[in-house]
Regions:
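Short, exposed beta-strand "edge-strand" segments with a Pro/Gly-rich flavor and a Y/T-containing core
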Residues: 8, 62-69, 124-129, 178-179
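Membrane-proximal N-terminal amphipathic helix
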Residues: 30-67, 71
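Intrinsically disordered, low-complexity regions enriched in Pro/Ser/Thr/Gly and acidic residues
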Residues: 91-205
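Short, glycine/small-hydrophobic-rich surface segments
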Residues: 58-93
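Glycine-centered flexibility motif
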Residues: 16, 63, 83, 100-109
Length: 205
């Protein structure tokens, strides 16, 4: 009788151990996935930050070298020729002229496209094919102010010059027809990301 009890208890204990291992395995995989996603997201944000630094430094040169500049697509080619684009975003062997309308491609198929607009917003960096998490982290990141980094606003969606239409003196976030302070709050970001193809537009003067 005691032996049967011991065998039964041993089996129950073994099942308990297996259940714990299963829970830990699922939790471990979940943690690894979150860490990988966070790492990838940080890489995308770092790349966008480096790109933005190059853009804001080059936009005045672009205006001087391209009199009457109005076609935003031409700035992609200009940045490529000036070697102001990270090598990791360039397709091997592609000519700079190929970047007139084609965005630069990074990790996880995230793409970067530069649009020269002129006016209050001189240039916009479009970052597309973002996951919801990437989008939310990007729009809640502090990209600076008009006086420090030249950053004047962020929007999500296809309308590249949404920020250009508002009368603002400080960095703003545009969601639909509403203007919010930048960076976006988490609630605003959750509303913006996931419903507009997750294209983030970072606008600089």
């Amino acid at each position: 009788m005691n032996k049967m009890n011991e065998n039964g208890r041993s089996m129950i204990e073994m099942l308990g151990v297996l259940a714990i291992i299963g829970v830990l395995s699922v939790g471990g995989f979940s943690l690894i996935n979150k860490m990988q996603t966070s790492y990838t997201t940080n890489q995308v944000i770092d790349t966008a930050g480096d790109f933005a630094n190059h853009i804001t430094k080059m936009v005045r040169e672009y205006e001087l070298d391209t009199p009457g500049a109005s076609n935003g697509d031409l700035m992609n080619e200009y940045l490529c020729k000036a070697k102001a684009v990270p090598d990791s975003l360039l397709e091997g062997g592609a000519a700079c002229s190929d970047y007139k309308e084609n965005p630069f491609s990074g990790i996880n198929d995230v793409t970067y496209n530069v649009k020269y607009i002129g006016g209050k917003v001189s240039v916009v960096l479009q970052v597309a094919n973002l996951t919801d998490e990437m989008c939310m982290q990007m729009v809640t990141t502090n990209w600076g102010t008009p006086g420090t980094s030249g950053f004047i606003g962020v929007s999500v969606g296809d309308e590249v010059d949404a920020v250009n239409k508002g009368e603002v003196n400080d960095a703003v976030a545009i969601v639909g027809n509403k203007t919010h302070p930048a960076p976006m709050g988490v609630g605003t970001a959750a509303k913006a990301c996931g419903s507009n193809n997750n294209i983030v537009n970072l606008s600089f003067k």
